Amino acid sequence: MTQTIAIILKFREDKAADFRRLFKAEVLPLWCKFKLQGKIISASLTPIEGGMPAERGVRSYILHVEVPRMAQHEEFDSNPLFNKFLPKAQAMQPEEPLVWFGETLFQV
């Protein structure tokens, strides 16, 4: 079975646009490369618009990725370009992201 990764990212409202630009420039091309190589099945970054009360001054996102196996997850996380991006994004976050992953159980 595949592996699903779900992450809730939170950014200070005044840094949200900077994060989106950075993500588009540095992570999206990696996603596209990994997708073409069959190492990502699907991936998305979605602004949270409902479900929980919004935190004042914070913009939250759902990052969802599905990969064939844990090996591709680890390969992405160890990619030098991703590791160059990560500290820049972390500096904009008021707290650690919420991260979950596991073997996909059902899928359509």
What positions do the PLM features span?
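Glycine/serine-rich loop-strand microenvironments at binding/catalytic pocket rims
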Residues: 1-16, 20-23, 105
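Short, well-ordered beta-strand segments in beta-rich or mixed alpha/beta enzyme
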Residues: 3-12, 43-80
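Short amphipathic alpha-helical segments
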Residues: 15-45, 81-86
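Intrinsic disorder/low-complexity signal
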Residues: 25, 65, 76, 94-95, ...
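Glycine-rich loops and low-complexity Gly/Arg-rich segments
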Residues: 29-35, 66-71, 87-92
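Glycine-rich beta-strand-turn "strand-cap" elements at beta-sheet edges
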Residues: 39-59, 84-108
